[in-house]
Amino acid sequence: MTPSELKRLYHITKVQLEYGLDELLPEHALTQLPKRLRKGLFWIKNKYPEKTLGERLRLALQELGPVWIKFGQMMSTRRDLFPPHLADQLALLQDQVAPFDGQLAKDQMEMELGGPLDNWFTDFDIKPLASASIAQVHTAKLKDSGREIVLKVIRPDIRPVIESDIRLMYRMARLVEQHIPEARRLKPVKVIEEYEKTLLDELDLRREASNAMQLRRNFEGSEELYVPEVILDLSSEHLMVSERIYGIQVSDIEQLERNGTNMKLLAERGVSVFFTQVFRDSFFHADMHPGNVFVNPDNPENPQWIGLDCGIVGTLNKEDKRYLAENLLGFFNSDYHKVAQLHVDSGWVPADTNVEEFEFAIRMVCEPIFAKPLGEISFGHVLLNLFNTARRFNMEVQPQLVLLQKTLLYVEGLGRQLYPQLDLWATAKPFLETWMAKQVGPAAFVTALSEKAPFWAEKLPELPDLVYDSLRQGKVLNQRMDKLYAGYRQSKRQQAKGQFLFNVGATLLICSAVLLTSNITVLASISAATGAAFWLFSWRAYRR
């Protein structure tokens, strides 16, 4: 560990102790090393005893800087790891930091573009429109068309800072696993691995540009969601240029109401957008917190969502979608046995899981929830309780499901903030039933057949040749198998013969030794020579 890393590690430890975060570690669960470390730093006291543990955790992460803020934001979605009072505080973390110098941002952009900004843009505003831990946004206009755009640029020299803190996180996670036995089930090293991948992905704006373009294609012409256009020719790894939009932030309820927005329709469209992304496109925006969602003000009676910042997206494969839909429908119908069986069938929990015990555990958790009116039930919290229960039965962490749960909680929270009477279940159930109907039965068979029709139309003329080639290859394969089997049998016969000759030779040599001790030298010599000959024959048999 370098001196700078030791200094940073001391600072991290000092901040944690100043906010009393050692309370997160139960005394009885600690080995001797962390106990001695705490005693060794006796002069560092909790400066904020009047605040709750959750508040202190949030404030400590804010003080430690952007890498830790983003880590806290990610951890706020892992409610299987943190109790609600901590997760709720982590969800309040804001990724807003002081902007860096606008001239430095301009220099970075010009380096990415390979020339002065004036070659491509006019009216560049050196004052940032927004600033976050990873990137900063400035406004300008395209020189050739006058179109308003925004330029998002990665903070210079942010990667070394991130990599340094990530290395320290790994060291701390390994120490936690080694010295706090109760924490091992939380797999802290694996948590850091997930975070590292997410964070490093955000450093490549080409990935975000690609995600935004895909989401824009998926909702092209839609009244429900608009995604700003990316100017791909001017974008690179550390710079993304896109269309500038004007909208009302979705959390600004007063402004939405002043604009005459149809709040009920807006809330329902949020749910529709989510389920369309998941079940139609298998590709969903996984960071839909209020800062990334705006509302188009132009047609308030027919409101349209605007999605920004596509750095984090989720995908589901066909099997995940089917099992997820069937699980949700199982909940709608209170069929907990089906929900338990689906978890086993999907491979989300081990195949040897006792389905009856699992069903009982799900029922115990979910029945009190479903005793409420449907309109008061949180869809996201049902999924959260389900996944937490499943993890007690050794369910492996499914990153795509964690992102899905996080996104659903965001969408549901926004929807009920916009329209408190929103019945997400009533909105979602017809959608799920329609989707399931398309996946099974005659209609699904016809759809699958039609999707494969171009492939089979291309391959049909080749079918006779393919059949002939398959038969010929099968015949050749059988001949090879027969030859290999014959060789195997011959080899076994030779081995048996060699073993027999070896045993006879050994017996004769033993006899020659006995005869020699009895001074019967002639017979001893004959027996020894014959035994040696048998050994020679056995060696030749093995060699074949």
UniProtKB/Swiss-Prot annotation:
Domain Protein kinase: 123-501
Keywords: ATP-binding, Cell inner membrane, Cell membrane, Kinase, Membrane, Nucleotide-binding, Transferase, Transmembrane, Transmembrane helix, Ubiquinone biosynthesis
Entry annotation: catalytic residues: 287 (proton acceptor)
Residue stretches spanning the membrane: 515-537
InterPro entries per record: ABC1_dom (IPR004147), Kinase-like_dom_sf (IPR011009), UbiB (IPR010232), UbiB_bact (IPR045308), UbiB_kinase (IPR050154)
A GO BP entry: regulation of ubiquinone biosynthetic process
Predominant localisation class: membrane
EC number: 2.7.-.-
Domain of life: Bacteria
Subcellular location per the Swiss-Prot or TrEMBL entry: Cell inner membrane
Topology versus the membrane: Single-pass membrane protein
GO CC annotations on file: plasma membrane
Pathway: Cofactor biosynthesis; ubiquinone biosynthesis [regulation]
Amino-acid positions noted as binding ATP in the UniProt annotation, renumbered to this chain: 129-137, 152
Record-linked NCBIfam families: PRK04750.1, UbiB
Role of this protein: Is probably a protein kinase regulator of UbiI activity which is involved in aerobic coenzyme Q (ubiquinone) biosynthesis.
Stated family: Belongs to the ABC1 family. UbiB subfamily.
This protein's name: Probable protein kinase UbiB
Organism name: Aliivibrio fischeri (strain ATCC 700601 / ES114)
Gene: ubiB
